[in-house]
UniProtKB/Swiss-Prot annotation:
Listed name of the protein: UDP-N-acetylmuramate--L-alanine ligase
Gene Ontology BP annotations: cell division; cell wall organization; peptidoglycan biosynthetic process; regulation of cell shape
Pathway in which the depicted protein is active: Cell wall biogenesis; peptidoglycan biosynthesis
Gene that specifies this protein: murC
GO MF annotation, one: UDP-N-acetylmuramate-L-alanine ligase activity
Source organism: Dechloromonas aromatica (strain RCB)
Catalytic activity: UDP-N-acetyl-alpha-D-muramate + L-alanine + ATP = UDP-N-acetyl-alpha-D-muramoyl-L-alanine + ADP + phosphate + H(+)
Keywords: ATP-binding, Cell cycle, Cell division, Cell shape, Cell wall biogenesis/degradation, Cytoplasm, Ligase, Nucleotide-binding, Peptidoglycan synthesis
Localization, UniProt: Cytoplasm
Enzyme Commission code(s) on record: 6.3.2.8
Family: Belongs to the MurCDEF family.
Length: 463
């Protein structure tokens, strides 16, 4: 690529999926520029890595570029995209540029509806502890590295594979992980769940003849597609039928302890302490152990990396204690969860990590389409908390849908009679609402994929 392309411009460079690729390309000595609607901690970090970032979109921003990279969030009427097409500059989807990076290394791609970011981070952490020094591109900030991407000197590139827009079908990894298959982003697949499952079949069948599929054997939808995947398959899960499975699972003060039994020619079992809570994270760790075993990371490195795992930004991220004006304090936790299935897993993890304490949820639904498609499931999972601060929908560019907004969700919750939501019209009011609702000894969990991500930092600043 480098003999033809020297200057690469990213439209929306501050996005989680875009910034990591831009950072790795900058370290590969490409000239990298980018634009975004607003400056952020991410754009400032990129500038520190040598990426020139412009706030705002304008045709002149792409001057000198040999290629322009866009995500699916960038519309065709963006002035930089229009200018690139007029000048015959290639406009490249983000996933296609990630695929080009993966051609330089042996790719490990982690796909699935839930758990991609944490599993990618766990795989990266174990490989790094094992001395492999992987390149990684993650959708969240790996706390141990202080970044969501890094160019490593080793042979492997570890990356998330995104099914939301079917862009994971650009990738050609040598190891593919599928954590689960659930109904989300269904508009991409014409609201046809079988089409979604078929996309995962196509993803796994992109493996070379020597490639390996690491999949969750507990997931019924994954089991359903395996007969259509004529590749080497390694399963993980809680079932004893899985090649890698967990036994003797104990939740202990925000950690998970378990024995990993490996039925793959490796007879030794591993005694694991995972430094993050939740049964869902036991599954994520099993996936990472399976990948690490496949690439011959030592048992000692696997055990050490999981015990010392520092987590991922906005994945059960603990902000510590926040003092209340009237005295006492509450524990503040932040999480990216925005689908009912992953929310239920995170809420269960919170109950396990903080037994006996009142759980307050501050939640901002993400997208009208998801709220419509999962409405009853949202009502069910939101009804399990002790107190609820419910924000209006974060649209993510979507037009409103009748009866799929925040107020409709609040009304349905009141009718259910299990929780009385405090509705927050403007997300800017959420920090004060949390301070008004929280009591001494509470656990306050902020959740959502939209602008609620800025709320915990503001709550933590209250004095």
């Amino acid at each position: 690529m480098k003999h033809k392309v020297k200057h690469i411009h990213f439209v929306g460079v501050g996005g989680s999926g875009m910034s990591g690729i831009a950072e790795v390309l900058a370290h590969l000595d490409f000239t990298v520029t980018g634009s975004d609607l607003a400056a952020s901690a991410t754009t400032r970090r990129l500038e520190g890595e040598g990426v020139k970032v412009t706030v705002g979109h304008a045709a002149e921003n792409i001057a000198g570029a040999d290629a322009v990279v866009i995500s699916t969030a960038v519309k065709a009427d963006n002035p930089e995209v229009i200018a690139a097409r007029e000048r015959k500059i290639p406009v490249v989807p983000r996933a296609q540029m990630l695929a080009e990076l993966m051609r330089l290394k042996s790719g490990i791609a982690i796909a699935g509806t839930h758990g991609k970011t944490t599993t990618t981070s766990l795989v990266t952490s174990i490989l790094a502890e094992g001395g492999i020094d992987p390149t990684f591109v993650i959708g969240g900030r790996l706390n141990a590295a202080g970044a969501n991407a890094r160019l490593g000197s080793g042979d492997f590139l570890v990356a998330e594979a995104d099914e939301s827009d079917a862009s994971f079908l650009f990738l050609s990894p040598v190891i593919s992980v599928v954590t689960n298959i659930d109904a989300d982003h269904m508009e991409t697949y014409g609201h046809d769940f079988e089409r979604l499952k078929s996309a995962f079949v196509d993803f796994l069948n992109r493996l070379p003849f020597y490639g390996v599929a690491v999949v969750c054997g507990d997931d019924a939808n994954i089991r359903d597609i395996l007969p259509r995947v004529p590749k080497q398959i390694i399963t993980y899960g809680l079932s004893n039928e899985c090649n890698f499975h967990a036994e003797n699972i104990v939740a202990d003060n925000g950690q998970m302890r378990f024995d990993c039994v490996r039925v793959n020619g490796t007879t030794s079992r591993l005694s694991i302490t995972l430094n993050t809570p939740g049964m869902h994270n036991v599954l994520n760790a099993l996936a990472a152990i399976a990948v690490a075993t496949e690439v011959q990371v030592s048992d000692a490195a696997i055990v050490k990396a999981l015990a010392e795992f520092k987590g991922v930004g906005r994945r059960f991220q603990r902000y510590g204690e926040v003092a209340l004006p009237a005295g006492g304090s509450f524990t503040l936790v932040d999480d990216y969860g925005h689908h009912p299935v992953e929310m239920a897993a995170t809420l269960a993890a919170a109950r396990g990590a903080f037994p006996g304490r009142r759980l307050v949820l501050a939640f901002q639904p993400h997208r009208y389409t998801r709220t419509r498609d999962c409405f009853e499931d949202f009502v069910k999972v939101l009804s399990t908390v002790d107190a609820l601060c419910l924000a209006e929908i974060y649209a993510a560019g979507e037009a409103p849908i009748v009866a799929a907004d925040g107020r409709s969700l609040a009304r349905a919750l009141r009718v259910s009679g299990k929780v009385e939501p405090v509705f927050v019209e403007d997300i800017a009011a959420m920090p004060q609402t949390i301070m008004d609702v929280a009591r001494d000894g509470d656990v306050v969990l902020c959740m959502g994929a939209g602008s609620i991500g800025a709320v915990p930092g503001k709550v933590a600043e209250f004095k």
